[in-house]
Curated annotation (Swiss-Prot):
PROSITE patterns: RIBOSOMAL_L31E. Keywords: Ribonucleoprotein, Ribosomal protein. The gene is rpl31e. This is Large ribosomal subunit protein eL31. GO terms for molecular function: structural constituent of ribosome. The keyword S-adenosyl-L-methionine does not apply.
Length: 83
């Protein structure tokens, strides 16, 4: 069974509650945790486009929110960036 959804993941709290040198890694962790919580799956594949978007403006200037398309196939969840 294939299920497709679109999520807007807020990253503002990562910006406000993290030192500038740890924002991008914590944002990637927050994205993974958000998807685990909302898809109820531990097997998550995050597309490289999401990683590039978070790291686009360096380590400390992450986006405030990010929109992703999530496709759930059997036991695998694949997340890609919406432009």
């Amino acid at each position: 069974m294939e299920d497709e959804r679109i999520y807007t993941i807020p990253l503002r709290d990562v910006t406000n509650n993290s030192p500038s040198t740890k924002r991008a890694p914590r944002a990637m962790r927050k994205i993974r945790d958000f998807l685990k919580r909302h898809t109820k799956s531990d097997n998550i594949k995050i597309d490289n486009s999401i990683n590039e978007k978070v790291w686009e403006r360096s380590l400390n200037k992450i986006p405030a929110r990010i929109r992703v398309k999530v496709v759930k196939e059997d036991d695998m969840v694949i997340a890609t960036l919406i432009k």
